[in-house]
Amino acid sequence: MTKYWIGTVSQEHVLRGVAGGFCQVCHGKATPLNRMKRGDWLLYYSPKIRMDGAEKLQAFTAFGQVTDDTAYPFQMSETFIPFRRNVDYAETRRNCPIDIVRTHPEWKKYAAMLRYGHFEISRDFFDFVRTYMQSPPDMVGQQQGFW
């Protein structure tokens, strides 16, 4: 059965993952990544633009489907070898700001969990964010019922 997940990662790191077709969460730990199975969906939430920066973003920034079976190590530097999973990212038209997501009935349950870095969500919540991210700007709110 397909599961849906959120990963909390800076936008800068999300963009690297999208460009490279991979995901990393929780500072490169393997355990959270191995909770996901091939065919599961990952939705990235980015609280900030850069991991060590102060500029807030607070938006969902990418989503994609896991395409492999297990986490694998990847040497980024001599001293940092994080684990990754391969992901086929979907095309999006825009980020989904947190103000939009706050209107979803499950938001309160998930908001407090964002600090954990990786957790399972419902398909309904995933589809809500996905629809916003893939809708043309003039369609959002009018025909999708967002506001």
At which residue positions do the language-model features occur?
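Surface-exposed, flexible loop/turn segments at secondary-structure boundaries
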Residues: E12, R50, Y72
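Compositionally biased, charged N-terminal/linker segments
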Residues: M1-R38, K108, M133-W147
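Short His-Asn-centered micro-motif
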Residues: T8, Y45-S46
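Short, charged beta-turn/beta-strand-edge "cap" motif at the junction between a beta-strand
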Residues: S46-D52
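Short, conserved, surface-exposed binding loops centered on an aromatic residue
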Residues: L33-M36, A54-Q58
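Aromatic- and Lys/Arg-enriched surface recognition patch
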Residues: K56-D124
